[in-house]
Amino acid sequence: MFEKTTWIKLPRNVLVGHGVLDDLGEAVGELYLTGRPLIVTSPTPNDIAGDRVRAQFDDPATAVVEEASFEAVEKLTETAEAVDPGYLIALGGGKPIDIAKMAADHLGVGFVSVPTVASHDGIVSGRSSIPEGDTRHSVAADPPLAVVADTTLIADAPWRLTTAGCADIISNYTAVKDWRLARRLRNVEYSEYAGALSEMTAELLVENADMIRPGLEESAWVVVKALVSSGVAMSIAGSSRPASGAEHLISHQLDRSAPGRALHGHQVGVASIMTEYLHSGENGEWSAIRDALAALDAPTTAAELGLDDAELIAALTSAHEIRDRYTILQGGINEAAAIEVATATGVIDG
């Protein structure tokens, strides 16, 4: 007897484009949420867009977060309990969005994502990434009820944040390969739909990397839509698998050993060059990934991540210890093999 079930939670409204920040009130109104909103933001996005958001709501409250941490989630939850909001609005980058996502989950209320940068797919997904000491935790939470992404704001954001978002998406290519490998060798549940959507999104950015340029709303449009697709793929899968494989394990290890050196998206981008080499060999697609990252002005080497060769190799050889997730690195890779991979792909000079 067939007894399989799935529960896919997706945003109800996704609004992307020129000047759509001024349509936030209408987009939220269509959700029929009640009560006052609590706007969760950080200093820079609050200065840039906070007043425009507050002007669209009656009696909004605002909480400004300074860091991403479990303590920040707890503090925001306490603030929200005092304010008694009907819902949260997360305005900014990964920091306020991840914090608001977790706080909303604790409070049992919905939240709306209003990204001002396109640095990673957390703007849409049902996952929060929270650092704790030398470890970064990926925590499940409900995805936003709506996403309102104004390409005017995002095009004006620092270019390195946008290239990090692009690199994060491009790394989906190898994440899906790891997922398929886990299905074949460990019978891990696999979603053809989610896998295909994630892979198609990565391929779209690889093929159009030379058309994505700083300051262009058209480029911001492409990147944000790709981030939305990646987040939707994770929601369909009910897992981060469509966007997180061995390349993310390497990045998490770098977060432990070399915290703050590089952006998350840039780390997984460089890592995906090497994991693709492990999947398909010297004639595989790793060079296409590297060339796409280079076309975006994203890092392609350890040095460009602010790492020396030894730090990169140490992360590559120990990444499999991060979590019990079957990937191409299962069982680990020894130092000699890691040096060969990193050298062959140009990630280190050798």
Swiss-Prot record:
GO biological processes: glycerophospholipid metabolic process; phospholipid biosynthetic process
Positions that bind Zn(2+): D168, H248, H264
Cofactor entry: Zn(2+)
Binding site for substrate: D121, D168, H252
Molecular function GO labels: glycerol-1-phosphate dehydrogenase (NAD+) activity; glycerol-1-phosphate dehydrogenase (NADP+) activity; metal ion binding
Signal peptide: none
Cofactor note: Binds 1 zinc ion per subunit.
Keyword Disulfide bond found: no
Main location: cytoplasm
Entry EC number(s): 1.1.1.261
Cell compartments where the protein resides: Cytoplasm
Keyword Repressor listed: no
Pfam families reported for this sequence: Fe-ADH_2 (PF13685)
Sequence positions that bind NAD(+): G94, K95, P96, I97, D98, T116, V117, A118, S119, S125
Catalytic activity: sn-glycerol 1-phosphate + NAD(+) = dihydroxyacetone phosphate + NADH + H(+); sn-glycerol 1-phosphate + NADP(+) = dihydroxyacetone phosphate + NADPH + H(+)
InterPro entries, sorted: G1P_dehydrogenase_arc, G1PDH, Glycerol_DH
Listed GO CC annotations: cytoplasm
Keyword terms, alphabetized: Cytoplasm, Lipid biosynthesis, Lipid metabolism, Metal-binding, NAD, NADP, Oxidoreductase, Phospholipid biosynthesis, Phospholipid metabolism, Zinc
Metabolic or biological pathway, per its Swiss-Prot or TrEMBL entry: Membrane lipid metabolism; glycerophospholipid metabolism
General function of this protein: Catalyzes the NAD(P)H-dependent reduction of dihydroxyacetonephosphate (DHAP or glycerone phosphate) to glycerol 1-phosphate (G1P). The G1P thus generated is used as the glycerophosphate backbone of phospholipids in the cellular membranes of Archaea.
Family: Belongs to the glycerol-1-phosphate dehydrogenase family.
Entry-linked NCBIfam families: PRK00843.1 (NF002022)
Protein name, as recorded: Glycerol-1-phosphate dehydrogenase [NAD(P)+]
Organism: Halorubrum lacusprofundi (strain ATCC 49239 / DSM 5036 / JCM 8891 / ACAM 34)
Gene field: egsA
